[in-house]
Structures are given as C-alpha cells and as structure tokens.
Amino acid sequence: MYNHNLVEKKWRKIWKDSNLHTFKDNLKKPKFYALDMFPYPSGAGLHMGHVKSYTPTDVYARFKRYQGYSVLHPMGWDAFGLPAEQFALATKNHPATFTDQNINNFKLQIDQLGFWFDWNKEVNTTDPNFYKWTQWIFIKLFENGLAEIKDIDVNWCQELGTVLANEEVLTDEKGNKVSERGKYPVIKKPMKQWVLKITKFADQLIDDLELTDWTVGLKNIQKKWIGKSIGATVKFKIQNSDSEIEVFTSRPDTIFGVSFIGLSSDHELVLKEKTKNKKIEAFLNELSSLKEYERTAINVEKKGVLLDIKAIHPITKQLVPVYVCNYVLSNYGNGAIMGVPAGDKRDYDFAKLFNLEIKEIIKDHPAPYEEDGIHINSDFLNGLNNEDAIAKIVEYLEKNKIGKKQVNYKLKDWLFSRQRYWGEPFPVLFDEKGNIIVEKNLPLLLPETNDIKPSGTGESPLANLTEWVNVKIDSKLYRRETNTMPQWAGSCWYYLAYLLKDGDSYLPLDSKQAYEIFKRWLPVDIYIGGQEHAVLHLLYARFWHKFLHQINVVPNKEPFYKIINQGMILVNGEKMSKSKGNVVNPSDFVVSHGADALRLYMMFMGPITASLPWEESGIDGMYKWVQRVYRLFETKQIDKNFNDENLEKKYHQFVKKASEFMENFDFNLVISEMMIFINECYKYEKINYDYMLNFCVILSCFAPFITEEINEVFLKNKKFISDNLWPKYDEKKIVETTIKIPVQINGKIREVLEINLGATQKDVVDLAIKNEKIIKWIENKKIVKEIYIENKILNLIIK
C-alpha cells in the first residue's frame, strides 16, 4: 500500500537538498512566466481557496517546463495594509511580528502541497529593500505630475479610521456605502489627500485591453468601471444673467428635443437657489437620505423642483425651464443634463410628471426612443441617422462656440493616502511654506512604534512620532507626510520585483540590466487569481505599468497577457469563510489523504473557472485512485520490449487528448483521460515501459510526489521525473481502422457490428447475415431491400 506521508516527506527533503526548485534562466529556451496573485499572509494560514488558485498555475508551469520552456513561477507576500493592521489591533500584537510568523506558516503549508516555488525569488512588500522601489515609483509619478495633494470629498470609514478609494467601497443589499474590508459604514468627508492621476491613462487602459488574452467578461468589467462615453458639452446661457449651464450629453444630436435642464442636488446653481427657495431646501434634505440606486434606477419615481431661472436654448433661443432632479448625479458629466423626453426614458417620465413638451425627434418612433433612426423636427439634422447627426451637430457647436466634442469617464483619480500605520511611508518632506521636497535617500523606513491605533481624527498614528515627523536639514525645518500608501501599492509592481530579486536585495528598477530582463520576461504569460481584483489590483497594476512604460523602465504596454479567474470552493452553496465557520483546512487533508490526492481532487472537481462544492467523498475517491495507480506498478510487469497494437493505439490517443486538454487548461479532462488509460492498462499483465514513464510525466504535473516515487522505485530512474520532456504522440497510430455501426431490421436496431472503415455494402451485408442475432430475425424471411449508408448504418427490409 502507498504510504503518502512517508513518500511526501521523503521527496520534500530530496527536492530541498538538491535545490531542484531553484530558478536558473536558460537563455537557449523560450521563456514562460506563470504567476499567482500573491496572498496576504493571514494568521489563519493557507485555505482551500489558495489551493484552488495555486494548483492550476503549478500544473501549467510544470507542463510548460516539460515542453522545453525556461519557466519562472514565483511566490511572495502582500503583507502591508488593512488586514494585517486590523488583526494587530484585535490581538494587541505588532503587525511586523505576526506577519513574519504567518509567512513562515504559509511557506510550510505551501511546501507540504509540493508547489514548485523557488524561495530565493520570494518577495515581501514590507521588506524595506522592496518598498524602496515602491517609493521610487511614487517619486517618479510625482515628478511627472501624476501625484498631487488635493482638497476633495473622500470616502471616510470611521471604523477603519481611514480614507478609502472608490474601488474599495461597496454598496450593500440595503444600498448603504460600506468598506470592502469589514463592510463598515462609509461617508463622504472633505480632506486633503494624495491622488494619483489614473484618469490620464483612461484611454490606454481601455484600448490596450486588445493586447491581452483576457475573457470578454473581465475586459468588460474594466471598461465599465472606466466608463468612457463620447459626446459633447453644450452651453445653455441663463436668462438675464452672465452665468451659463454646461451640460454633458452622449447624444448631442437630440438637442432639438430639449424641454428642460436637469441639475444635480449639489450643482452650484442649485446651492445658490436653495438659500432663496424653501421647496428646494426641503427637496435637498429629502435627497440627502437616499442611496444612489434609489435615485437613479429606471423604475424609481422621478422627482424635482423648478428653479427660479430659465435657460436659453443655444440654437432655437427658446426659454427652457431648469429643475433640480433626483436622478441627476454630480459624478457624471458636470452634474447637469439636457432633458430630452423623446430620447430618454427617465427624461420622458420626468416630463410626463411636470407636463413638459415631448417633441418627437426620430421618424416613425414614438417617445421615448433611444436607438438609431432618421431625425425629424431637428432643423439642419433632419433626414440624418444618429452617427451623421452627431458629427454635424458637434461641428456646429464648435463652430459657433456653444459647445464641443468631449469624452467623459466614470473613472476618478486614485485616492492614494491612508490614515494608518502599516503601509509604505510617503518619501516626501514639506517645508514651512508647504512646498514638497522628495526624499533623496531611499528607502524611507517605516518607524517602529507600538501605538498603531487610528486616531479617528483623520491623522495617521505616525503623526504622534514627533521625532520622526519633524526633520532638520541644513538648519531648515521640514515635516514628513504622516499618511501611508494603500495596500495596493506593492502589488502594482511585485511581478517586476520577482525578476529583479538578487539575494536579499533587488537589481535597480531603472537599470539597463533590469530593462533587458524585462525585455525577455514580460509580459506575464499566465496570471491566475480571483475576479474580485478586476477593478482594484488589476486596474492599478496596469496603470503603474503604463507609467513605467512611458518613462522607459519597461519595454511593453501590458503587464499580464492571459488571466484566468479561478472559481470559489463552496460549502452548502456558500463561499468558505471564517465568519461562517465552514473553512476546510488543506493541511488536515494533506495528512489524511496526501497532497497528491488533494491537488488531483481540486483539479478534477470541474473547470478551474467554476465555483464548485467541496465534497469529502470526492477526495476519498481521488485517494483511492492514487492507490490504484501505485498498485498498478506494484502488480504489473513493466517491460521495455512489450508491445500490443490495441494498447499502443490507446496510449497515443491518451497522450494526444491529454496534451490538447492541458494546453486549454481543461485539467479535469486530463485527469479523466488518465483514469481511462489506467483502466486500460489493468487489462494487461505486461505494460510497455515508455508508456508508463510518459504517463508518469503527465501525472506528475498534478501529483509530483507519487510520480517521483514510482519513477525511482519501479521505473528505476536515477534522474528526477521532471528531467523528462513532454511525451509525443503519433497520429498514424491513432487512426481507427474499424468502426461500429447499428444494423436495423425493418427500421429497428437488432445488432451492432464492428466493420472495417470503408467496407463495401456487399461486405457489410455478408457480415450481417452471418451474425447469430441477425440470423434469428431473417430466418425464413426474404430480404427485399438493403439500405446502407457508408460507415453509418445498415437497414435490411424483410418480408
């Protein structure tokens, strides 16, 4: 019987002692960069979600290594940020202490599972040698005008004691804004904050998605978040005033259908009118208690209050009423819309409520109609379709200086300050006049302190460290920035850090040597991780990469060529989580069933992108199959000279299917093919040696421990199983020479015959009438007609 605990312990030691997993780039081979989304090293340790994510990357990296690639598959730790700090506060520990302990535990668990990682390439975002370069990138962003301090309304989370980026704020089932981490309430609050101008790269972030092999769904998530819309701004003058309202519209061609102007509740004109109109003040108070979705959903009742001003239509010169509307928001365009009831459902509902004119503007399409059509009642746009009408009206607006073509984005600049302790310090100083000076000596170390509790006032705990905060240089006084960078900073460039890791330090990010390494290894070929990072980590990392490309640090435009989002592991239909008490510890199953069985089960559950239920009976079954594989080698004779025509065909079919499925990440189907092949092998007392060696090569991608043992004990090889090449198959030996076809008597199937491919009708009929089952049906009967479709079916009509 196969003892997985003894075998796995044995091979872990051998691999470590021999430095098998040490990365050495072979420049004669093509490169392949496989990457996992590196984890936050929590106290809970590795969970099944990690195993579901890391196993497919490991399987595929081994496959590419067998195919002759120089493969880099590294691992590291995303250790700064809120999770570590929250845990530190809850346990009254310092985050640095337990982070190191947790990392050691993670590494132990990872090694238990047989993942092929070179720990010499390990990165840790809290390592000063690492965050030196995070700080360097920030300085470059600042020097290039892409980082600045602004007075802005921020997402403030009192419970976490910090500001959050838009991407870190969720809307709960009740419509409340809550933090992604902990689901705590989030409110708007004015503060001075660092922002990074990600919006400068909005078009590149959309356009360059075409350079990637991402799923349409993942691309659309990013496109939707960026929210690009092309339209025009139009200026409506205010009657008897020098003021004007500038609206943004994605349909400027509908301008002749305008019957009102709608303003957001915080538009400057609304706030000005509020002081003179009690109705407006009451309406704004009502809106302040509503959630965004309660204001913008199509089926929500439209409400508004008429302002005591009139706008002048820029073309027709007609007076247009102005309303503050519940469904107009400040975060789109300029917080002002031109209401076109005939061309927008929400505008239509609003116009109906206030008895406003609804002018039909698209021929043969009653209001509201939002699709393409021929314009009517639209002056010089009459007879044009949407595209032509938009082009013509934009030209008119620009020529007459009453508007212009404009691109609008939902994406906002990245709020980059956090009022917490556990993060990268900003490498800047402020002089007594508030001017910013960048640090020359990097890294600027995070000072040690046990007082890490958020102040709750908007200041970081670092503000209490007066000796660190206040700096004297050449008799001048300076003050350090006391905010820290968000947890996303290190993950924006860590995939580059793996390539530059050199002992305990890193090659300079801006060196020629680094550029040459990046030329060889970028982009990352396969990146596997959760879809929850689609508008956080993935968007931020792409932004930083594009900036680094702009300043000639990296040679290419995109960091990650192919991304696969693995599914979740479910228990009773719910995601595994500590709060639900349904977490399954992988280490327990490594002990009880073995790492190979666990890895195989994880890949056999279904497609890696699917969220699938954890079934203990499933890993029990995989444990039995691992034993069955081992027993085959124990009980059968492995012979280099043995051959069997049928087994040879089955072997080549197996290798072909396994190779194709591996290439397409259909790992569950590869395992199915291995099971079928093992079943076939059990029919023989002898098995060909080469077949079994190559079977072990394929199996080793999933089950590295048992295959090393079989390779040594039964196949008598002194080299590692990983020293082999991926097996090849011979198409000629796969070709079928026979086929099974049904034989019908008077249209009913009575037998299935095996015939030679391409057999003539005479040959097939002769074979059929000699068959015992067919004889029983045609005895004492006359065959009046034979119907034969080659290689498909034979039908005998009898009387």
UniProtKB/Swiss-Prot annotation:
Organism: Malacoplasma penetrans (strain HF-2) (Mycoplasma penetrans)
Domain of life: Bacteria
UniProt keyword Ligase, yes or no: yes
EC identifiers of the protein: 6.1.1.4
Entry keyword annotation includes Thylakoid: no
Catalytic reaction(s) noted: tRNA(Leu) + L-leucine + ATP = L-leucyl-tRNA(Leu) + AMP + diphosphate
Taxonomic placement: Bacteria, Bacillati, Mycoplasmatota, Mycoplasmoidales, Mycoplasmoidaceae
Name of the protein in its database record: Leucine--tRNA ligase
Cross-referenced PROSITE patterns: AA_TRNA_LIGASE_I
Pfam families: Anticodon_1 (PF08264), tRNA-synt_1 (PF00133), tRNA-synt_1_2 (PF13603)
Motif ('KMSKS' region): 575-579
Keywords on record: Aminoacyl-tRNA synthetase, ATP-binding, Cytoplasm, Ligase, Nucleotide-binding, Protein biosynthesis
